[in-house]
Amino acid sequence: MNTFQMRDKLKERLSHLDVDFKFNREEETLRIYRTDNNKGITIKLNAIVAKYEDKKEKIVDEIVYYVDEAIAQMADKTLESISSSQIMPVIRATSFDKKTKQGVPFIYDEHTAETAVYYAVDLGKSYRLIDESMLEDLKLTEQQIREMSLFNVRKLSNSYTTDEVKGNIFYFINSNDGYDASRILNTAFLNEIEAQCQGEMLVAVPHQDVLIIADIRNKTGYDVMAHLTMEFFTKGLVPITSLSFGYKQGHLEPIFILGKNNKQKRDPNVIQRLEANRRKFDKDK
């Protein structure tokens, strides 16, 4: 399976939609957009082809479902009936688009040197990222959106599974509600896990649909965490970052792990970006 074959397969599977397609050969992307308002999404075909080797038609089914829901929610309609309980935060990489395809700025905040917080209207099976043009219809200010979203993410269930590897404890939050990574914003939940940790606590959001927390009690644990984050990062439909974060008393510090059985390393470049963010936050306060 190559990108051209995947392009054709997706176009065939999505032929029931009233959409047009635009293929970018250089970037190996396929833009799928509505014919009535030109709103749409762009899919990275090379990433899907890479996953196809392992997941076969399952990954195609996932993409088709995702596109179906996204295109349906992009229909022009009123937002006045949206309730405050539908405002949610979503985590994205700092490289994520800052504006819509129409050039309208999204509502977002910096989070760490590797992550940013965007805000969305929950629509059941999907959600719509909030941009500046939606504020008037929502009758909300940016600050109200921030407060509502944090309140709502704290109300989510934080059920998790655990696994022990070589004496290290790993917690997996994977409810597939679209907000697993968003739970990194629930400081009370993270503090609850921190109180149980006997070693160093690491947190990771490799993609949108998982939050990994680790109680690292020996050197092997760092290697396991590095492997887990990279594996999840490469398989996620909405990847965020392959880096882990050290967590202590409400503070997140991006780290990465070098070499087998080596303790975590603080990357000077990452720290420089993080410090730049901190200075900006302090200035804005």
Swiss-Prot record:
Q: What species was this sequence derived from?
A: Staphylococcus aureus (strain COL)
- This protein's source sits in the domain of life called Bacteria
Q: Give the protein's recorded name.
A: UPF0354 protein SACOL1793
Indicate the secretion signal residues: none
- Provide an example Pfam family for this protein: DUF1444
Assigned protein family: Belongs to the UPF0354 family.
InterPro entries from the entry?
DUF1444
